Amino acid sequence: MGLALAFKCANQGLSVILLESGGFGDRGNAEARLGSAEILTPHHAALEAIRCQGIGGTSRLWGGRCVALDDIDFEKRDHVANSGWPIPHAEIANYYGEALTFLGCGIDAAHAKNAERTAQAEIATDMPEYWSAEPDLRRQHGARLRNSANIRVYTLCTVSGIRLDSDGARVAALVVKSGDRSFEVTARSYVLAGGGLENARLLLLAQRDWPHKFGGPNGPLGRYYCGHLSGYLAAIRFNQQSFAKSLWYRKSSDGSHLRHRLAPSPDAQRKHALLNTVFWLDSFSIGDPAHGSGALSMLYLGLALLGLYPRIGNGLAPSPTEPRSRGLRRHLSNVVRDPRLLSSMFSVTWQFSKRRLGQRAFALMNPGERYLLRYHAEQVPTSESRVFLADDDRGGTPKLCVDFRFQPQDIDSVVKSHEVLDDWLQREKIGRLDYLTDADRQSEAVLNQALDGYHQIGVTRMADDPKSGVVDRDCRVHDMANLFVAGSSVFPTAGQANPTLPAVALALRLGDHLRRIASTL
């Protein structure tokens, strides 16, 4: 987010100082310079998996998926506590094209109008996601950053504190550490863009000196921490391959990739009290005979016989079934029972050869018309899910404690969303779901797969009322004249989308706001 914002401001004639804890090189050791954290829940990813120092930040860990939020995400929903944004979706959507271009999704994606879920259909089938051709933003924009006349980059410089002026109404300076040195940086406006956890840590540290700032000790700062639930609860079997193909990866005219997903409509969400959820197709691993395809089993057996599968085949796609159910006999059964084996083998071999030669490696379409169904679901924001500073200040920087919680509503909504989708598939004679878990264990299966910490949403949430949020509709910290926050930590709700695209769009919007107010600060 910081890189997008820096370019936006610089292109409009503003002078920018970019403070980066890492450098231009390979991924740094975040723990060495950033503060430590204690994860209090098994449902939150480890710090080394979610933090990355260096130009481009966590884009080095990012897969490249770009997805827009939906209009319903911005509504106050009766069945979703603490929902509603103070701005409409259009305020962000106006910047999606520019954000897609910055993220490397190609010209076609940048000019595409985001599809809206129709109220008439219970399940939408045209929800697009775009893929960046180069997710690592350091590689995309590093040279441009070095050559920018309006951006001064200071690497290996970690912001360790925020110093306010005498009445606490403005930021006077940022406290910066670089190696053994400590110094201050001053500017007219300051933007925290260090990721949700680090943004929250810096504000919580400032709150220790100013206890009534940012909503006070029991206010919204650090609370409403949420992300997404993702995993597999079912496979999907189609009655015809053409429908699966409409949901599969394809190239646009400029060479970028996109695909479409399945999603309950806004009316269906309201009717069934669902959190926003989407589904997409994944291939079974070719080593898992649960795919039901003789051609995929033949490909696996051939690679295994030649000793190549462990090197180039293993991990082509996920496999949620038990290893003991993946024996040779089941693969041979797939081969014998496949009436379209020869034609399917040609298709699979062609896909596999393209997959190995292409720049981006996507999974294989299944001639057996059975796919894993991946869900990606919203988490309800709750104040009990939070981050806070430990009382122990050992090491100089207080440890950040992460108490990230899923709620029963989150789990129930995932299960119910599958039921709504299955009813629609069968009613429309499109296909059906094959559950991977017995009905009485489905909630347990969803909870066991529930893990986030990558998206870091809500801990500096946006609201018009300082009692309900940390920043206002312009991403300015309440009661602070010149302090702003960029990133998904300002989202009041998570929606179904991974937050990269809307967070960049919101950062670009902030850049325009900073230009408008530059002469007043």
Kindly label every feature range from the protein language model.
Residues 2-3:
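N-terminal Rossmann-fold NAD(P) dinucleotide-binding loop
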Residues 8-69, 87-103:
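N-terminal FAD cofactor-binding segment of flavoenzymes
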Residues 11, 22-25, 45-48, 162, ...:
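Glycine-rich loop(s) and the adjacent beta-strand/alpha-helix scaffold that form part
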Residues 13-16, 23-29, 69, 96-107, ...:
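A generic secondary-structure signal for well-formed alpha-helical elements
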Residues 27-31, 58, 64, 73-74, ...:
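Short, solvent-exposed loop/turn and secondary-structure capping segments
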Residues 42, 47, 78-173, 447-449:
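Conserved redox-cofactor binding core of oxidoreductases
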Residues 154-167, 351-385, 397-494, 500:
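A glycine-rich dinucleotide-binding beta-alpha-beta segment and adjacent secondary-structure elements
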Residues 193, 201-367, 519:
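Mid-to-C-terminal "cap/lid" subdomains and adjacent gly/pro-rich loops that border
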